[in-house]
Amino acid sequence: MDRIIEKLDHGWWVVSHEQKLWLPKGELPYGEAANFDLVGQRALQIGEWQGEPVWLVQLQRRHDMGSVRQVIDLDVGLFQLAGRGVQLAEFYRSHKYCGYCGHEMYPSKTEWAMLCSHCRERYYPQIAPCIIVAIRRDDSILLAQHTRHRNGVHTVLAGFVEVGETLEQAVAREVMEESGIKVKNLRYVTSQPWPFPQSLMTAFMAEYDSGEIVIDPKELLEAHWYRYDDLPLLPPPGTVARRLIEDTVAMCRAEYE
């Protein structure tokens, strides 16, 4: 339940509006509310980090509003809480009125939800499940440059899960659609909340089965097999894509060195 911020309130401050995050001096604000001119604003505690509260403040600041990507180098737990704040702020902003009857909505006091004051419909934050998969072929890994990555970064394949589809089916479909190959021996690795804007990445490793690379030009600029010790520019540390690549490299080194 949200409340008015008082002078001595302290902690981490996730100040967000329209999927942007307030980052004075390029950092997530930490300290007393008065130091950031937040006294009198409404805040909702969305978690704790290292014993300190993490607050969500739905507010637009004139300066220093940036992307949550700018804090990806934070500790994983704090980055996830910052992402939670940005996603919740957008959820509350976009669910002021009921999609069924049009009446005004209000936030639940017990969970992350919005409730209709008229028809009692209940809405939850949207989460879009995605798959991401590292594909190994002997001593090489399949890496691709996506059309949305114009900075030369090469990464593993990924895509959204479709309605009525299992995660395993999504992997097989996305890999075939984007690269034209089939995979086998699929193994789940980990997951990562990814607030761009509201994804949940489910990460897998797989082995090459059959087929030749034929890219989907709408999705990829190129895709190639890269030997584990001769890789192109990779995604930054802290991303699940980077972890998948590093795990694959470690497996190759254990087998070929």
Swiss-Prot record:
Residues annotated for a divalent metal cation 1 binding in this entry: 158, 178, 219
Known catalytic reactions: a 5'-end NAD(+)-phospho-ribonucleoside in mRNA + H2O = a 5'-end phospho-adenosine-phospho-ribonucleoside in mRNA + beta-nicotinamide D-ribonucleotide + 2 H(+); NAD(+) + H2O = beta-nicotinamide D-ribonucleotide + AMP + 2 H(+); NADH + H2O = reduced beta-nicotinamide D-ribonucleotide + AMP + 2 H(+)
A Pfam family this protein belongs to? Zn_ribbon_NUD
Q: Which cofactor does it need?
A: Mg(2+); Mn(2+); Zn(2+)
* UniProt: substrate binding residues: 25, 69, 111, 124, 192-199, 241
InterPro entries assigned? NAD-cap_RNA_hydrolase_NudC, NudC-like_C, NUDIX_hydrolase-like_dom_sf, NUDIX_hydrolase_CS, NUDIX_hydrolase_dom, RNA_Hydrolase_NudC, Znr_NADH_PPase
Q: Give start and end of each Nudix hydrolase domain.
A: 125-248
EC number from the UniProt entry: 3.6.1.-, 3.6.1.22
Q: What does the cofactor field's note say?
A: Divalent metal cations. Mg(2+) or Mn(2+). Binds 1 zinc ion per subunit.
Which GO molecular function annotations are given, in alphabetical order?
magnesium ion binding; manganese ion binding; NAD+ diphosphatase activity; NADH pyrophosphatase activity; RNA NAD-cap (NMN-forming) hydrolase activity; zinc ion binding
Q: Which Gene3D superfamilies match?
A: 3.90.79.20, Nucleoside Triphosphate Pyrophosphohydrolase (3.90.79.10)
Record-listed a divalent metal cation 2 binding positions = 174
Q: Name the positions where Zn(2+) binds.
A: 98, 101, 116, 119
To which protein family does this belong? Belongs to the Nudix hydrolase family. NudC subfamily.
Outline what the protein does.
mRNA decapping enzyme that specifically removes the nicotinamide adenine dinucleotide (NAD) cap from a subset of mRNAs by hydrolyzing the diphosphate linkage to produce nicotinamide mononucleotide (NMN) and 5' monophosphate mRNA. The NAD-cap is present at the 5'-end of some mRNAs and stabilizes RNA against 5'-processing. Has preference for mRNAs with a 5'-end purine. Catalyzes the hydrolysis of a broad range of dinucleotide pyrophosphates.
Subunit structure of this chain's protein: Homodimer.
Q: Can you name this protein? A: NAD-capped RNA hydrolase NudC
